Each structure stands twice: as structure tokens, then as C-alpha cells.
């Protein structure tokens, strides 16, 4: 899908003459016509005003009206999209308008579109935000896994999007920043697509080795540095917690380090650590069979940090960013780790593994110790860590834990800006009491109360040497039911966070 931006002056004659399959125009409710809507009304000798007067189209949120072969317009179709009341035109209202337009376009054969919704900026937002957000939302809605991996079905699906080329209309004064925003939106969408592909692939394809090869391909495509450690190297590093999770599987584990060096050599890096459990049976603490197929998504943290690195590299951000991915399967077998086993982590702290299904924190804790060597400015781990986070926050907000208020505020702000929201959760010291063990420095679970919080508190014990945040994406990484599939979150949040850092 190709995006471009174009400065259009609606006051000039012929502004609507450009040929395309559809011209998309936004209209506010109970508002004097302006911009593209006014130009259309003038070109059609009052058609828009008559439609409003007759009540056929009032500009209400979530509504649209498709017109064909409108005189004076170069496009084969005109799609009017309701924006609601201008005073209530928030970022979410803007996103709703984009999605409303896409639903209407899906019922047509339109391939080329002139898109003017980008002339309407949401409250407290600018044109660059409108362009970037439109591009990411359009690409998000257009994603079709089977179109990208047709080998997985014997017959091709016929429900793919027909959109191929979109020209985003912007004010002349914003033309330069809008062009940059469109490119950045495309980069973010490409990162999300990679994240979704990795999540959606079955676990017999997306193995730890597959993730490692994906990192190598990203490194090749964007001239990044990559290192993949195998079992012997992991053993040499004394990552006892990580190794405990790997014991039950025949798939070899991997420890991936992917470096993007876009900033000065002396700039401390931002390190993103992604949980890469490519399939999670729960191990000896076996999960119920129903819904276990969705445990292929337990590597979405890893997928998202790889997707973020890809986006950052394509954008060419002036940052140093490192993705670290511990990856393996969690399987039961005769040699698998058992409940009650005690292991020594890379940090030297000992852990009583009370539940082998709380494995994500075990592979992450060693990774969080490993990244100390980078002397990071910030470390953010991303993981489908706890079902308890879904109980607490549902599928709207990612659970976010942070040691410092400044980092927490920056992540919350990035989530709001990207429409990929996170909600800060507590890390009070009192929760650490639940992790006490009679047989080791700590247990790997703290009981049912505050399960997401105690999981984060467990990780906090391994992050005292740097500024750290934890994103629990168990409720936001994928959808179940008819819309089953990976979402690509939190790539938008993470990329916005990095963009905001300069």
C-alpha cells in the first residue's frame, strides 16, 4: 500500500479535479462548511448543503454516505464521513472517523483514494499526528495474515482490502512535516505487521530458531548488529532461571541481542527486553487444554521488540536501541523442571519454582541481569506475563509498572499519543512479602491476590541498577474469537516513546 501527501488549496479552482477511485471528505455536525466539504459544495452547486438540509447526512460520528459520479469531481466516488461535533473532536473521534471511512471503502472496489480527513486535526494535535495516525490505522485495518502467508491455506481468501494508493491531503504549511509523518507511520505499520506475523504463525513454524533468524534478517535488511547465543553460551553465563524453563523441550533455546546504533557512540541505549516463549503448555504445571492453542502468542513480547527495532531502523531515529530476546518453549517431559525445584539465576539470587507456568518471569529475570552490561539509560521489558493483568485491565490498557515517575509519565504519554494506551500499576514494597520462600531467596509466584503486581515485583528484584519499566501485554497482544489474531501492540507505544526521546 502506497501513501503520499499533497498540499491542496480548496479555494483554488480544480482542487477536486484529481482522478481517483474515491474522494474521502469529513464533515462536522451542525457546522459551517469549510475546506474540502465547502469546495465540494461549491463544485456541486450546493449538493452538500442540500444533503444536510434534507437530513440525509448530518455529519454525526460513525456515519458515512457514499456518492457516485458526482459532477465537478474527478473521483469516481465521493465518501462523506461524519466527524461529530467539532468541539468534541478528540483523538479517539478522529480514529473513529478513519475506521468509519475504511468500513465504507471496504464495500467498494476503490483502489486509489484521495483522503482529506487529514485536514482535520484532533483537539491538541497537529497535522503530522493526523497523518501518522491515519497511516497506521489504515494499515492496521488492512492487515490480512493469510495474504502475507498464503502457504498456510490451500485456497486463497477473497476478503482482502482493495486499497493500493492513498493521497493524504494536508495544508501547504504542513507539507514537509506531513511527508515525514507518512514515512514514519509506514515504518510503524511495517513493524506492527512483523509483530503480528510472528504472533500469528503457528508454533511449529515460529520456533526460537525462527525468531533468531528473523532477527538476523532484520539486521541484514537494515545493517544492524545481531548476536544469537545458543544453549552452551547461555549455560556459560549461568542463566539458571532461563535454562530451567528450556529443559522440557527438544527445541533449542536462543538468546537474541539486536542492536540499532542511530545515536552518538557515547549515548546510553534504551534496551527493550521481550519475552519469547514460542509455545507455553505451562510445563509440569500444565494448562487446561481449552484455549491452549493461543499460547503460541506467548512470544508477542519478543515479537513486539523486534517489530519496534524494525520500525526504529526504518525511521532512522537518532537513538541507540537494543532488543534482547530470551526465547524457548515451555514443555512438560521426563526431564522438565518440577514445582518445588530451586534454581540459581544469573544474578546469583535463588528462586523456588512453585509453579512452572510462571515461566515468563524466569526467562526475563536473567535477561534483565544480562542487560546491565550495556549501562542502559532505560530498560523496558515487554511480556504476555499474567492472566491477572487481563482480570485487572481487560483488553484496553496495557499494564505498566515503572520504578520512576518520569519514566511512567513518558510511557503513559506515549500511549495516549499513539492510541496504544497503558495504565500505571503499583509496585509498593509491601507486595514483595508475597514472594517469600522458606527454601530460596524468593518464590516465582505470590499467590492469587495481585498476581500481575507480584509478577512485576519479582522482576523488580533484578532491575535495581537502572531505570526500568515493565509492560504486561497479556490483555492487549492478541484478540480471541472471530477476530482472533495478534494486534501488533505495543509497537505504536514503544516507537512513540522513542520518537519523543529525540
Curated annotation (Swiss-Prot):
Compartments, record wording: Cytoplasm
Catalytic-site annotation from UniProt: 287, 361
Taxonomy, superkingdom: Bacteria
Textual note on the cofactor: Binds 2 manganese ions per subunit.
Residues that, per the record, bind Mn(2+) 2: 275, 280, 298, 359
Catalytic activity: Release of an N-terminal amino acid, Xaa-|-Yaa-, in which Xaa is preferably Leu, but may be other amino acids including Pro although not Arg or Lys, and Yaa may be Pro. Amino acid amides and methyl esters are also readily hydrolyzed, but rates on arylamides are exceedingly low; Release of an N-terminal amino acid, preferentially leucine, but not glutamic or aspartic acids
Reported cofactor(s): Mn(2+)
Broad class of where this protein is predominantly found: cytoplasm
Role this protein plays: Presumably involved in the processing and regular turnover of intracellular proteins. Catalyzes the removal of unsubstituted N-terminal amino acids from various peptides.
Family (UniProt): Belongs to the peptidase M17 family.
HAMAP family recorded: Cytosol_peptidase_M17
Protein known as: Probable cytosol aminopeptidase
UniProt gene name: pepA
Amino acid at each position: 500500500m502506497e501513501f503520499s501527501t499533497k498540499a491542496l488549496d480548496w479555494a483554488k479552482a480544480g482542487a477536486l479535479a484529481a482522478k481517483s477511485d474515491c474522494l474521502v471528505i469529513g464533515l462536522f455536525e451542525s457546522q459551517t462548511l469549510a475546506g474540502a466539504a465547502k469546495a465540494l459544495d461549491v463544485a456541486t452547486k450546493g449538493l452538500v448543503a442540500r444533503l444536510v438540509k434534507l437530513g440525509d447526512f448530518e455529519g454525526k460520528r460513525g456515519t458515512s454516505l457514499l456518492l457516485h459520479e458526482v459532477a465537478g469531481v474527478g473521483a469516481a466516488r465521493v465518501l462523506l464521513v461524519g466527524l461529530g461535533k467539532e468541539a468534541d473532536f478528540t483523538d479517539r473521534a478522529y480514529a473513529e472517523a478513519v475506521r468509519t471511512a475504511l468500513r465504507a471503502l471496504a464495500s467498494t472496489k476503490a483502489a486509489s483514494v484521495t483522503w482529506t480527513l487529514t485536514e482535520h486535526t484532533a483537539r491538541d494535535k497537529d497535522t503530522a499526528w493526523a497523518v501518522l495516525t491515519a497511516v497506521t490505522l489504515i494499515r492496521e485495518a488492512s492487515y490480512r495474515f493469510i495474504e502475507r502467508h498464503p502457504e498456510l491455506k490451500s485456497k486463497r481468501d477473497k476478503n482482502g482490502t482493495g486499497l493500493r494508493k492513498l493521497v493524504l491531503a494536508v495544508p501547504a504549511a504542513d507539507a514537509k512535516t506531513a511527508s515525514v509523518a507518512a514515512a514514519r507511520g509506514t515504518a510503524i505499520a511495517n513493524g506492527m505487521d512483523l509483530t503480528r506475523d510472528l504472533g500469528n504463525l503457528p508454533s511449529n513454524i515460529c520456533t526460537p530458531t525462527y525468531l533468531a533468524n528473523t532477527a538476523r534478517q532484520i539486521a541484514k535488511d537494515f545493517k544492524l548488529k545481531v548476536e544469537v547465543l545458543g544453549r552452551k553460551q547461555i549455560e556459560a553465563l549461568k542463566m539458571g532461571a532461563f535454562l530451567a524453563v528450556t529443559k522440557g523441550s527438544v527445541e533449542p533455546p536462543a538468546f537474541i541481542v539486536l542492536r540499532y546504533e542511530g545515536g552518538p557512540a557515547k549515548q546510553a541505549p534504551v534496551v527493550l527486553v521481550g519475552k519469547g516463549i514460542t509455545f507455553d503448555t505451562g510445563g509440569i504445571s500444565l494448562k487446561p487444554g481449552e484455549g491452549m492453542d493461543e499460547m503460541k502468542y506467548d512470544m508477542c513480547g519478543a515479537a513486539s521488540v523486534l517489530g519496534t527495532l524494525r520500525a526504529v531502523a526504518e525511521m532512522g531515529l537518532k537513538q541507540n536501541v537494543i532488543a534482547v530476546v530470551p526465547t524457548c518453549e515451555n514443555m512438560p517431559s521426563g526431564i522438565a523442571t518440577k514445582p518445588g525445584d530451586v534454581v540459581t539465576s544469573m544474578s546469583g539470587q535463588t528462586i523456588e519454582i512453585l509453579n512452572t507456568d510462571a515461566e515468563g518471569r524466569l526467562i526475563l529475570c536473567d535477561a534483565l541481569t544480562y542487560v546491565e552490561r550495556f549501562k542502559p539509560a532505560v530498560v523496558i521489558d515487554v511480556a504476555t506475563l499474567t492472566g491477572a493483568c487481563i482480570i485487572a485491565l481487560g483488553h484496553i490498557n496495557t499494564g505498566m509498572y515503572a520504578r520512576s515517575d518520569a519514566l511512567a509519565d513518558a510511557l503513559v504519554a506515549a500511549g495516549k499519543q499513539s492510541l496504544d494506551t497503558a495504565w500505571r500499576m503499583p509496585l509498593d514494597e509491601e507486595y514483595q512479602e508475597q514472594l517469600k520462600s522458606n527454601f530460596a531467596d524468593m518464590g516465582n509466584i505470590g499467590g492469587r491476590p495481585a498476581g500481575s503486581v507480584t509478577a512485576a515485583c519479582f522482576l523488580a528484584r533484578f532491575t535495581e541498577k537502572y531505570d526500568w519499566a515493565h509492560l504486561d501485554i497479556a490483555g492487549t497482544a492478541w484478540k480471541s474469537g472471530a477476530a482472533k489474531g495478534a494486534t501488533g501492540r505495543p509497537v505504536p507505544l514503544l516507537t512513540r516513546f522513542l520518537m519523543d526521546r529525540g
